[in-house]
Amino acid sequence: MNSQQSTRTKQMLQQSSTHLLCGVVLLQLFAAQVDAQRSTSPWQTLSGDAPLVIARGGFSGLFPDSSLAAYQFAMVVSVADVVLWCDVQLTKDGHGICFPDLNLANASNSEEVYPNRQKSYPVNGVTTKGWFPIDFSLTELQKVLFSLIRGILSRSGKFDENGYSISTVQNVATQMKPALFWLNVQHDEFYEQHNLSMSSFLLSTSRTVSIDFISSPEVNFFRKIAGGFGNNGPSFVFQFMGKEDFEPTTNRTYGSILSNLSFVKTFASGILVPKSYILPLDDKQYLLPHTSLVQDAHKAGLKLYASGFANDVDIAYNYSWDPVSEYLSFVDNGNFSVDGMLSDFPLTASASVDCFSHIGRNATKQVDFLVISKNGASGEYPGCTKLAYEKAIKDGSDVIDCPVQMSSDGIPFCSSSIDLVNSTTVGQTHLRNRSIIVPEISSVAGIFTFSLTWHEIQSLTPAISNPFRENGMSRNPNERNSGNLISLYEFLNLAKNSTSLSGILISLENVVYLREKKGLDVVKVVLNRLTETGYIVGTLKVMIQSTTRLVLVDFKNQSTYKTVYKIKETIGNITDSAIEDIKKFANAVVINKASVFPNSDSFLTGQTTNVLERLQKFQLPVYVELFQNEFVSQPFDFFADETVEINAYIFGAGINGTITEFPYTAARYKRNRCLGREEVPPYMLPVNPGGVLTLISTSSLPPAQDPNPIFTHDDVTEPPLPPVIAKSPTSTLGTPSTIAKPLRNFLKVIRIVSWSVAGVVLFLVLLTLVFCFHRKRETRLRQQKLKALIPLEHYTYAQVKRITKSFAEVVGRGGFGIVYKGTLSDGRVVAVKVLKDTKGNGEDFINEVATMSRTSHLNIVSLLGFCSEGSKRAIIYEFLENGSLDKFILGKTSVNMDWTALYRIALGVAHGLEYLHHSCKTRIVHFDIKPQNVLLDDSFCPKVSDFGLAKLCEKKESILSMLDTRGTIGYIAPEMISRVYGNVSHKSDVYSYGMLVLEIIGARNKEKANQACASNTSSMYFPEWVYRDLESCKSGRHIEDGINSEEDELAKKMTLVGLWCIQPSPVDRPAMNRVVEMMEGSLEALEVPPRPVLQQIPISNLHESSILSEDVSVYTEG
């Protein structure tokens, strides 16, 4: 920054604390500030001008909404005519403040400062609790301890301790001096009911403040202020809410008003609508065809502004988590352009309008670097499939990559992982029994490529990677299993036939293991394939990448292909000797993003790392990985915008190439017109690493971290490659060279054979005797071990027969055995579950029983004994007269339970699961929670039973390694079906519990549920019906007719808990201890969960490849 800018900044520091903050912003985040240059491209707006960028509450995507810091930052990083948006609220003494919500608690610390000032008021006909500005004076709201905080909890809370104060409308206008100022009045009628006049405030404010826009969702408000501002007054914009919501002053729905835009034109010059009014989404979050609303508004002479833009919220899957693509779809689609966009991230909106609009795929490139795909366009299709590679080529990749793996029969192919579980649905197929642990590769069991033939691999279904599934972010679910894996030969031909690619990158890992253990020479195979497909001479550059130095040396010695050395570790520096060594065998280097910009707690630290500079000094190009569009992959410094991140690494750091799962985003950046200007606008200047941290209060700073290690010559040194082992030859039958033999040789052979036969017979007799002795001894020792291990009665199989009177009375059947009624010698009636005959030594069964024998809880069925005799196994537990829960909720008994009884049962089951998950010495995950496995005693106290599918795990283990699918269809958690849904853990039981609770609710409302589902020709998803029924209760009606308020509260609480438990992503589900708190807490404390999404479960595959429990009662009598 030049001396004049530094002087100007110092002056700002002396003016006020607010200007101090903004001066730091200017110093730390951006290298310069220049006026944006408007594009001269034609626009399809009403005026023909570029769409307005409207900053909602300033830059509210980073700073607390409506803080002076948010407003000034928006002005610094946006287009010159950015519109500052202020949601106007009135204090009890009539002052207008900028605050985003009628309830102060939603974006301030009012609850902490004024804990006893909560009140209830009717707002649009709904009684609402909160802290309202009409109960506070401006002085009270501007006291030192009162401050603004984030209103959206998923955003960083680091700025909550900065003490940003509430500002008046006049304060924002005079301090910020915005080019355009927009005041939004959301609740005029509410203030009028409390003797506060919003219209009077605005009219008096307009005498000292320049107001350019006034918006409101209330028709009468515009009638009151009509004519009050004169001919040169602000533009009036009518704001539309949800189409089914009622406009409070006309009692008409906004949807009905939308159909009469000529009526709106009588009092407004523009309309503000949610973006879904223009580009609606289907139930799966995909775009539907655009509506004609923009064209209709323009025909009526109305400008149309769109709201709801934010980089860190869910957007249509069509945009591939790229916010720039979303903005462009509203302003540059060839059909229409909105007149403005209301955004929490005005920097991205500014860049979209000014830098990326109206540029085609063939536009001039403003910057040169390599766009290298990662497993093709693997952010949009399953990686390494033909579809992913074709998409990567179409999207503008310069280089496509193939991570080479080897099949057992020596066929090289492209796959993102040597473990097929990570990239396909092999775990759901009959091939899951190929699972092994290879310590040289991973400590986790997997199904490795070298264990399957190429024919078997070709039969597998690929699976899209979902690295942020636990954050609730999925990738293109419609295509999650599309495409087919391709061989290296097919990959090479696909690339060769492309006219746009400049090269290919082939990555090789695990080469040493494959040579030494499997006899597979990957280097030789790859070289042969390259030769066969004509890559010896050609225009495409071939790059060979590996983390193993000697693999690259081997290629160097046998070919002229370029080699790329990948440094796996995150490093903070690199020595000259290490670089000199690398340069001997590599032409380029790959490092990760943190080796360029270190970060801590999702913020760039600003620590100096000169790794990139040092490598480039030795003439080594540096490619950086991994670039992903999902905002959770990026530090907060990049404002949840992948384009900002790419800009920092290309324009800021100067890397030579990006390795990305979303090639389109990186390729589009090359055509960024703003980079070709003499003065680059502020929204395209690279952020300065560590700049955002300087704006955070000391108390909220992340802990200091040790510097990343230095990469030295020793890190490059490796032992020599082992020789390729010879594969075992296939045995063949030989043919004697002659048939004629001397007679004596024939007799000699006869004698040898005779003695050999006799010896074999004697050996077998001795072996049988030893085996019998050993087996008896082993059985005796095993019985002694069992008695010491399990503190339960150990019954013989003969005793089990006597207890059950030779299995006379069947009381239930399950997927793993039959339940009989029996009587012990002391007269106690018991249930005896006899498991189906099993092979093996039964260690899993013994471990399960041993652990369960040490459990004791009111809501867990009590084990009384067991039998383990050879393949005969049985469990003996208490007999419960009322049988299983399903009888009562499915109407198989005359007993009709009320909501209180059902609530107690649901709560009891929750307590039981909480005990299994959080109170046992070793956590037990049940995996088969359903009404049939909940038994009821004579007091209807529930007890969780049937642990046939249970799995034990240490409490510290949050993720379970499983290759089979366990449970009952309808209750199985999505992550049990495929890893693309998330990881299997104790949260899988939470999902099953949620379905159990919802089934209880559905049973109580059976007639209503049947009517709703029958009326939907697409067979309504059951949780969807529950959710809709819950929504209909917001109006005040009970969730079931004929019940009292207490029962209605219990029913609604169960509904909310059930819906939270069945969230598709495990991370969004509460743990069972939290479920118990929710069930026992107040209804008011529960938030409404997101709407459940229908998951299509491949049932046919489940039956083929899973451990499924039959959906039958544990007890059929009682």
Curated annotation (Swiss-Prot):
Disruption phenotype: No visible phenotype under normal growth conditions. Its main location: membrane. Pfam families: GDPD, PK_Tyr_Ser-Thr. ATP binds at V811, G812, R813, G814, G815, F816, G817, I818, V819, K833. Gain-of-function mutant plants snc4-1D show a dwarf phenotype, express constitutively the defense marker genes PR1, PR2, and PDF1.2, and display enhanced resistance to Hyaloperonospora arabidopsidis isolate NOCO2. Residues 773-1118 are cytoplasmic. The two glycerophosphodiester phosphodiesterase domains are predicted to be extracellular and the kinase domain cytoplasmic. InterPro entries: GP_PDE_dom, Kinase-like_dom_sf, PLC-like_Pdiesterase_TIM-brl, Prot_kinase_dom, Protein_kinase_ATP_BS, Ser-Thr/Tyr_kinase_cat_dom, Ser/Thr_kinase_AS. Residues 805-1094 form the Protein kinase domain. It comes from the Eukaryota. Keywords: ATP-binding, Cell membrane, Glycerol metabolism, Glycoprotein, Hydrolase, Immunity, Innate immunity, Kinase, Membrane, Nucleotide-binding, Plant defense, Receptor, Serine/threonine-protein kinase, Signal, Transferase, Transmembrane, Transmembrane helix. This is Protein SUPPRESSOR OF NPR1-1 CONSTITUTIVE 4. It catalyses: a sn-glycero-3-phosphodiester + H2O = an alcohol + sn-glycerol 3-phosphate + H(+); L-seryl-[protein] + ATP = O-phospho-L-seryl-[protein] + ADP + H(+); L-threonyl-[protein] + ATP = O-phospho-L-threonyl-[protein] + ADP + H(+). In the N-terminal section; belongs to the glycerophosphoryl diester phosphodiesterase family.
